[in-house]
C-alpha cells in the first residue's frame, strides 16, 4: 500500500508515474545541505544515478500535470480541516522570492526587484488549524517565471497579475472550494488596500495595517498609529517573543474602512481595529501590530492570536529555503521542473505536519525517537520541531531500508569491519 492509499488520498497519475511520485515524496523526507540538495535515493535496490535520472524524467514530464500533482495536497487539506475542532480554518497568504542569481542555465528567470534579484517568485497560501496555529497543508501555490505564472490549479501558465489582484483571485478560488468551514484569510501589510479589501464581499479577512494608514473613526479621519494611542488596551497574558517572555496588551475600536483620500465614498463597510502590543517587564514596547478585520464573532484576543500564527508561513518558507529543502540551490533548469519539485516537497511537508500534529500515544512515542535519530539539539521549551522531524524521518527510513534488504549476518559483518576502525561501541 502506497502513501496515497494509506492516507486516503487520490492520485490520478498513471500507475508508473504514481509510483515515482510516491518514491519522490519519500526521497524528500530529509533535510538537505546546500551542496547536496539533489533528490536523495532511499532505495537500496537502485543506484543514486538511476534514481537521479528517474527523478529528472518525472520532473520534466509534461504528462505530470500540476493539477494532478496538487490533488493529494488539496485532499489532505480537506481531511485535516475537517478533523480540526474549530469551525474556522486560517489561511495565511504570502510571497517568497527565490533567488537564482548564479543559475545562468535557468533562462526563464525574472527580475523580481533589483538587477541581482533574479529567479522565480512563489505565492503560497498555507492552511492553519484555528485552535493551535499549526500548519495543515498548502492551499494554493503559484510560481512566477518568464513564461507566466504557473499555478497548481491550471495546466498552462497564466498571465501574471499584480500582487493584490493575484491575492483576490486566489481568495475567490479558495472560497469556492468544498471545505465546509469558514476560512479566515490572514495577510501581512501588503494587503492594506481598502479598495481590494472592500472587493472581498462575503469573505472573512484579517490583515495588518500600516501605521500611516487612515480610517474613519468618530466621523473623523485618523491614522492607525494615532488611533492606537486613543484605544484602551488591557493585558491579556504572557507570550513568548523571540525566546523571552512578553506581556500582551490588546485593545479594539470600530472604524469605517475608508481612506482620507476617499471622502466621496458612500456605504464603506465598518470593520474592527485591533491594536496588539508586546511589552517587557519594564513596560518597554517590544512590538506593536495594527490589525483590521471584518470577523465579528470572535474576541480581539483571538484575532491578535490568529495574526501571530501567520508566522507559520514564514517558518515554512525557511524550511523550503534553508532549514529543509534548499530550494534556492536546486539545479533543475526550468520553472516547470522547479514547480513540480516544489509540489513534491510540499507533499512531504504535509506528511511531516500530520505526524507533528498527531497527539495519539503512538505518535507521541515516535516523535521523540525521531528527534533522537536526527542528532539535533532542540530547545527544552520546544523539543519537537519540523526540521528535526524531517531529519529524523530520513534516518529512520534508511534504517528500515537496511533491515528490509540486508541479513543479520551482513549487518554483523559490517559492524565488525566498522569496529576495527572506530572501536567496539559501533
For the regions a language model picked out, list residue spans one by one.
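Single, function-defining residue in the core of a domain
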Residues: 1-106, 114-121, 126-426
Amino acid at each position: 500500500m502506497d502513501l496515497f492509499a494509506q492516507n486516503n488520498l487520490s492520485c490520478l497519475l498513471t500507475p508508473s508515474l504514481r509510483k515515482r511520485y510516491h518514491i519522490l515524496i519519500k526521497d524528500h523526507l530529509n533535510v538537505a545541505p546546500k551542496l547536496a540538495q539533489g533528490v536523495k535515493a532511499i532505495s537500496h535496490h537502485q543506484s543514486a544515478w538511476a534514481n537521479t535520472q528517474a527523478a529528472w524524467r518525472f520532473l520534466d514530464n509534461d504528462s505530470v500535470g500540476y493539477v494532478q500533482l496538487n490533488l493529494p495536497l488539496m485532499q489532505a487539506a480537506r481531511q485535516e480541516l475537517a478533523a480540526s475542532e474549530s469551525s474556522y480554518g486560517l489561511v495565511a497568504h504570502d510571497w517568497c522570492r527565490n533567488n537564482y542569481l548564479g543559475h545562468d542555465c535557468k533562462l526563464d528567470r525574472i527580475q523580481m526587484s533589483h538587477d541581482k534579484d533574479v529567479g522565480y517568485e512563489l505565492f503560497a497560501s498555507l492552511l492553519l488549524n484555528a485552535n493551535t496555529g499549526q500548519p495543515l497543508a498548502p492551499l494554493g501555490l503559484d510560481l512566477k517565471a518568464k513564461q507566466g505564472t504557473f499555478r497548481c490549479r491550471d495546466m498552462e501558465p497564466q498571465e501574471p497579475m499584480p500582487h493584490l489582484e493575484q491575492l483576490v483571485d486566489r481568495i475567490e478560488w479558495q472560497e469556492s472550494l468544498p471545505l465546509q468551514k469558514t476560512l479566515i484569510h490572514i495577510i501581512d501589510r501588503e494587503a492594506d488596500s481598502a479598495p481590494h479589501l472592500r472587493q472581498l464581499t462575503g469573505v472573512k479577512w484579517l490583515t495588518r495595517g500600516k501605521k500611516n494608514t487612515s480610517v474613519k473613526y468618530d466621523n473623523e479621519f485618523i491614522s492607525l498609529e494615532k488611533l492606537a494611542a486613543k484605544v484602551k488596551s488591557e493585558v491579556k497574558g504572557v507570550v513568548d517573543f523571540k525566546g523571552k517572555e512578553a506581556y500582551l496588551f490588546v485593545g479594539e475600536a470600530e472604524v469605517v474602512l475608508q481612506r482620507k483620500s476617499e471622502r466621496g465614498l458612500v456605504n464603506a463597510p465598518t470593520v474592527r481595529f485591533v491594536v496588539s502590543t508586546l511589552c517587557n517587564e519594564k513596560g518597554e514596547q517590544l512590538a506593536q501590530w495594527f490589525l483590521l478585520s471584518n470577523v465579528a464573532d470572535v474576541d480581539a484576543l483571538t484575532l491578535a492570536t490568529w495574526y501571530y500564527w501567520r508566522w507559520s508561513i514564514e517558518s515554512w518558507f525557511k524550511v523550503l529555503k534553508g532549514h529543509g529543502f534548499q530550494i534556492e540551490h536546486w539545479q533543475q533548469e526550468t520553472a516547470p521542473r522547479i514547480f513540480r519539485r516544489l509540489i513534491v516537497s510540499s507533499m512531504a511537508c504535509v506528511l511531516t505536519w500530520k505526524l507533528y500534529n498527531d497527539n495519539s500515544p503512538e505518535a507521541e512515542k515516535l516523535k521523540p525517537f525521531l528527534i533522537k535519530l536526527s542528532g539535533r539539539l532542540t530547545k527544552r521549551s520546544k523539543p519537537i520541531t519540523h526540521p528535526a522531524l524531517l531529519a529524523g524521518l530520513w534516518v529512520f527510513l534508511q534504517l528500515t531500508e537496511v533491515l528490509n534488504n540486508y541479513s543479520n549476518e551482513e549487518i554483523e559483518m559490517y559492524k565488525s569491519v566498522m569496529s576495527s576502525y572506530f572501536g567496539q561501541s559501533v
